């Protein structure tokens, strides 16, 4: 029984040693990647922050979370872009239809009524253009709000996952730092993936 307990201890010690080696390797790679960031950002990423980040990355779960968040973000951006293109296309169609309707009306109009018709058509065109501008502004506001919500969701998810540096904020400096941390995680994930392929 004593020998079995000793073997369990050796396995646990070996696992701990592997985890420490992986932590050190991740930390070293993070320190290398940080050198490519602007100096203002480098100063904000202390050894402790990078060490905590390396610890959070140990089991690979955070890599999967970040990958999932990026996929959701790309799908959201693609969907919002499609919605904006659709609105733009509808507006273009509306203006073309109005232009053709006005042209037909002018061709059927008696010459002495033409100035009145053109003035009415000008007012109608201005009203349509105002409506188009308003709808585009509303669409752009909707896009910004939806993207802001995605950022909050990402911050919350990564904070709950225990990733150092992530919490809900709208502070531009903190957002820049979080974006840089995400970029570090993404680059480290690529390196990990490439090294796994090399050994397989």
Swiss-Prot record:
UniProt keyword annotation of Flavoprotein present: no
The keyword Cytoplasm appears for this protein: no
Disulfide bonds: none
Pfam name, any one: DGCR6
Coiled-coil region(s): 116-146, 176-198
Keywords: Coiled coil
Sequence similarity: Belongs to the gonadal family.
Record's protein name: Protein DGCR6
Taxonomic placement: Eukaryota, Metazoa, Chordata, Craniata, Vertebrata
Gene encoding the protein: DGCR6
